[in-house]
Amino acid sequence: MIRFGPYVTPWGGIGAGPLGDGVVPREIALQSIRNIGIMAHIDAGKTTTTERILYYTGQVHRPGDVDDGATQMDYMEQERERGITIMSAATTCSWRDHRINIIDTPGHVDFTSEVERSLRVLDGAVAVFCGVGGVEPQSETVWKQADRYGVPRVAFINKMDRLGADFGRAVQSMVERLGAKPIPVTLPIGAEDGFRGVIDLLAMKAQIYHEEDLGATFDLVPVPDDLIAESEAARVALMEAVAEVDEELMELYLGEDGVTPEQLRAGIRRATLAGNLVPVFCGSSLKNKGVQNLLDGIVDFLPAPLDRPPIVGRILIDGVPGDETAIRQPDDEEPFSALAFKILADPFAGRLAFMRVYSGTLAAGKVVLNVSTGKRERIQRLLRMHADKREDLQEARTGDIVAVVGFKEIRTGDTLTAEAHPLVLDEMTFAEPVIYMAIEPRTKADQDKLGAALQAMADEDPAFQVRKDPDSGQTVIWGMGELHLEIVVDRMQREYKVACNVGRPQVAYRETVGKTVTAHGEFEKDLAGKTNFARVGLVIAPGEYGSGTTFVNEVAPGALPPEFAGHVEAAVRQACDTGVLAGYPLVDLAVRLTEAKWVEGESTEMGFRNAASGALWDGAKAADPVLLEPVMTVEVTVPPDFLGDVTGHLNSRRGRVIGMQQRGTDQVIHAEVPLVEMFGYATQLRSLSQGRGVFSMLLARYEPVPEKVAREITRLYAGA
């Protein structure tokens, strides 16, 4: 029998002196640190899994329950009321003498930016899938995000106790929908109501959990007779899968002595770190089964900071990032470097900046350089966070994820370094908002607070934007979906005590061009007795989808001063903020500056800006402008009795049904629907399915609006 040990807090001072005083031995070896994220589709059981991890590692005395609104990680009122994760939350725990820094990320598509910035600074991830649903739409999104950052993963097939749970089907969905190479390292004993434990394929033992202590202890017993053949076949498949991608294990597998569990474990680790395989565990977090195996997998298979490539940054030349790069190894002896990946307004500690330390050490009270702003900042406090609780630290070291108090000016994505060794890390990028609505204060007192509250939330959330409508003067807030903006407004009223009125949500359309044109702009005007003159020629062409606006200066060297070329580019980009059909941003344009005329003493920045913006707008009008709308990938799950009504309703909303499949006793409809047609869909689906249907959606792409719909949108804009 394996028994969970006594409660031991993972906190503790690092016990090191300030920068420059010499590096003392680490409390936790760098090889024993795991920086991981927990990621999943909404309702896969991600937060419940995190709560069980905290319980089994001794971080909490009793696991929190999502349904009761009593979880450690979902501490916002809005999270507890809705039973979902809205903001990523950080915590730390210990397992087998390893420190595990965990970031629990949201599963709802509206909060994908939280996942994006977390994956940027993490070394590994746990992907949680529902044993019934398998891979779902948001699962695909976060998986692609992890692919982009090259983050090694393990998977946990959760909810094996639920009706319709099927481990094999869930694993197969990873192959079909993610293109992954999953390798089960545990198998379920039973399913649905009969799920009672797991088989460890490395040890070839069964684990039967004890209900009286919430699964903290379990019996190790021989594999049940009826599962021996399946388990042996699965272990052979596991060894063969690893041997195919790991030469060292292949030699052992073909040798006479066979493969020991330790050798197999080492081979799985190498294959996981290389991104060739994904170890898969199974269990039920709610029913306290299988989570300890997952913890073992985090320690055994996910990378330490030493296992990840060193960071590369650009060296500053006269304060500007140049083409020359520098490498920072994950080592306490290297110059300090870190990335600020999250800003949070804490009611007790003030403004917090979460950072990942990539190299060197940093002591409280010391000064760092914010390379992104060029400003020196003194660190007042260093904190290790446990959701909304905090523990003071004397020092942060390589591999640590900590919160910092003391920055006067900092943004998500800023690079922090030692003053004497500056370099700039790549900035973080986020998807553009797809929805917006007007907001106004109810009273004069609210008006004074509105701007500060909106700015504070925009600082926290890079996917949330605040803009002024240039025509009406209204304040407009932009976000990733209805729920995103609903949460913003709710926080305004609860946290910032600002009463406000909001308009109806509107779709964030975009504009582009359909053909290549040449356009000219000229500005010649006498202002205050001085002539202002500039003339430019632009070639405007359709660009690659998702490319934004690209600008190339093709004017002969020396024919135009560089500062004027810079003003032209800045004006072109600014002009693209307002389109020519309905005032929506112009995107995916390839702009070339091919002509320019200037006169010494008469040409100015203002002149070139006006000439360039005029040329851009005139050219866009002549280039067959096109209105674009966001189209969503929609997945609707309903009982078979309602399939016809729901499908017909989707078709009536300009939806395209692209496939159907059976999932347990339900039918799953895969469709693509314009976002504007999905407003209020949750209410209508409840009516169509007698409350038994559920749906999820995520952005697929932008595509041209049908001509009839586009005419109505432009008519409303012209009459505004």
Descriptions of predicted regions:
Residues 2-720:
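Structural and coupling elements of P-loop NTPases
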